[in-house]
């Protein structure tokens, strides 16, 4: 098995954004403020999250970025002398650099947020036209990660055409077979989106970051627009491939946190299933958005939280925790700390995520926002085997079966039809399993297996 896995290790794409010290080669692991706090942030919120990442053992598992999302600056203006953005003194009385320093003292890294427009999504000053100044500022503050959004775009920087993103957070739909029949002003078939105003806006910030004497991981957030999957890896180390994971903000549960909904997890997974095979590689990772694990009493079930994390990890999307860690429930923390999925996600040898190999509920390659591909597999030398994820996308308890002869990584090896299998959730050795493994799953739950050597 190990020899076979070594043979299929791939070489990175020639035009990928390769950064010093391996920054961005693997998908990011960390915590981000937006899903849990939105604009209700300050130094205490950020430093509490950083301390919890250490205290809860998440740092030891590779979670390293503590990201300050939107709303960190003064909203009305830049510094009239330097043109720099000004940290909100009420929220960050000692400035962003002080927060960054304290995070670095914990052995962690710090991220900041801006937008490739005139204002951020919450209406704060953004970086279009100020790329050099802002990149210099972020480097001076010793920032390690930049999330760069796509709000506040002036008319003279808007794209001449509209790109189809078959996502209800972006467009009304419906999306038959993943198409957008009602799309206004579609681009000609030969249009090169890498030369679009969108690509140029994001490229300008990359150029500014590259002039700094500091490596800053660059995360693009344009929600799949402008065919970003075709050029994102040239400009950033990750790029959002869909609309926001929770676009309908405002609904809260009894614990006063936003309620995450399974429908968005399924919809984004469905979109990602048609992208990962072509676009996800070392140095460039499609981003399914920040995690919702642990968000909202009365929202997703524990089973749905498990499936959400399993799918994001298997797809090797960046894993940015988006919940309040000082009040997280143990069952949710256990999901975020799953060693099997984190090992696969951070495998330094294999240059690809898990791919869907069977849709299950639907015929293969069916575009269905409610019932995405249910069977995924990917090789992992770090796990000494193949990761297999089985999803029950139905609304009721149902059985799923992994048939070894259908798993691509287990084919053509002349190894017979029996393999050593481990339960990826519990770590339990399931023994030598012949031909297939069958499991009953709750609604929207996922089984995780590591299929090892022939036996």
From Swiss-Prot:
Which residues are the signal sequence here?
1-16
- Indicate yes or no for the key word Glycoprotein: yes
Which is an annotated GO molecular function term of this record? alpha-galactosidase activity
Q: For this UniProt record, give its keywords in alphabetical order, as a comma-separated list.
A: Disulfide bond, Glycoprotein, Glycosidase, Hydrolase, Secreted, Signal
Q: What does this protein do?
A: Hydrolyzes a variety of simple alpha-D-galactoside as well as more complex molecules such as oligosaccharides and polysaccharides.
**Gene Ontology biological process:** carbohydrate metabolic process
- The gene is aglB
Q: Which GO terms describe its cellular component?
A: extracellular region
Residues bearing glycans: 42, 177, 192, 395
Question: Which domain of life does this protein belong to?
Answer: Eukaryota
Which organism is this entry from?
Emericella nidulans (strain FGSC A4 / ATCC 38163 / CBS 112.46 / NRRL 194 / M139)
- Note the SS bond partners: 39-71, 121-151
* Catalytic activity of the protein: Hydrolysis of terminal, non-reducing alpha-D-galactose residues in alpha-D-galactosides, including galactose oligosaccharides, galactomannans and galactolipids
Q: What top-level class of enzyme does the UniProt entry assign?
A: hydrolase
UniProt-annotated binding residues for substrate: 222-226
| Family per similarity comment | Belongs to the glycosyl hydrolase 27 family.
User: Per the annotation, which location comes first and is thus the protein's main one?
Assistant: secreted
In Pfam terms, one family for this protein is Melibiase_2
Q: Please name the taxonomic classification of the source.
A: Eukaryota, Fungi, Dikarya, Ascomycota, Pezizomycotina
Family annotation (CDD domains): GH27 (cd14792)
- Matching SUPFAM superfamilies: (Trans)glycosidases, Glycosyl hydrolase domain
Documented EC number(s):
3.2.1.22
Any idea which residues are catalytic in this one? 149, 244
Does the keyword section mention Glycoprotein?
yes
Places the protein is found? Secreted
Q: What is this protein called?
A: Probable alpha-galactosidase B
């Amino acid at each position: 098995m190990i020899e076979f896995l070594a043979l299929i290790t791939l070489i990175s794409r020639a035009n990928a954004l390769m950064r010093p010290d391996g920054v961005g080669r693997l998908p990011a692991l960390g915590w981000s403020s937006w899903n849990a706090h939105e604009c209700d942030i300050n130094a205490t919120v950020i430093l509490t999250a950083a301390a919890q990442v250490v205290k809860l053992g998440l740092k030891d598992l590779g979670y390293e970025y503590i990201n300050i999302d939107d709303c960190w600056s003064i909203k009305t203006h830049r510094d009239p002398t330097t043109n720099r953005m000004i940290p909100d003194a009420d929220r960050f009385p000692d400035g962003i650099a002080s927060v960054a320093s304290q995070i670095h003292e914990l052995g962690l890294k710090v991220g900041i947020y801006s937008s490739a427009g005139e204002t951020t999504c919450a209406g704060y000053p953004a970086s279009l036209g100020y790329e050099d100044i802002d990149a210099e500022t972020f480097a001076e503050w010793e920032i390690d990660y930049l999330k760069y959004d796509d709000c506040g775009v002036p008319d003279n920087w808007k794209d001449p055409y509209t790109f189809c993103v078959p996502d209800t957070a972006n467009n009304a739909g419906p999306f038959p077979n993943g198409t957008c029949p009602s799309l206004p002003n579609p681009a000609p078939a030969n249009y090169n989106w890498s030369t679009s105003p969108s690509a140029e806006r994001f490229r300008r910030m990359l150029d500014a970051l590259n002039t700094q004497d500091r490596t800053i991981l660059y995360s693009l957030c344009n929600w799949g627009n402008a065919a970003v999957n075709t050029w994102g890896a040239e400009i950033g180390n990750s790029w959002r491939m869909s609309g926001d994971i929770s676009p309908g903000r405002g609904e809260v549960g009894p614990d006063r946190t936003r309620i995450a909904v399974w429908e968005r997890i399924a919809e984004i997974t469905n979109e990602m299933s048609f992208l990962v095979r072509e676009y996800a590689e070392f140095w460039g990772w499609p981003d399914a958005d920040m995690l919702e694990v642990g968000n909202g009493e009365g929202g997703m079930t524990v089973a749905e939280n498990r499936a959400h994390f399993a799918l994001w990890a298997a797809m090797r999307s960046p894993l940015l925790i988006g919940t309040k860690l000082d009040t997280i429930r143990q069952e949710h923390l256990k999901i975020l700390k799953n060693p099997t999925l984190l090992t696969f996600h951070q495998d330094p040898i294999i240059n690809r995520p898990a791919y869907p190999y069977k849709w299950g509920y639907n015929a293969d390659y069916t575009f269905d926002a409610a019932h995405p591909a249910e069977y995924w597999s990917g090789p992992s030398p770090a796990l000494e085997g193949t990761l297999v994820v089985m999803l029950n996308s139905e609304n009721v308890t149902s059985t799923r079966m992994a048939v070894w002869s259908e798993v691509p990584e287990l084919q053509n090896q002349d190894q017979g039809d029996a393999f050593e299998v481990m339960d990826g959730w519990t770590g339990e050795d399931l023994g030598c399993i012949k031909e297939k493994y069958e499991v009953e799953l709750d609604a929207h739950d996922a089984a995780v297996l590591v299929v090892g050597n022939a036996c």
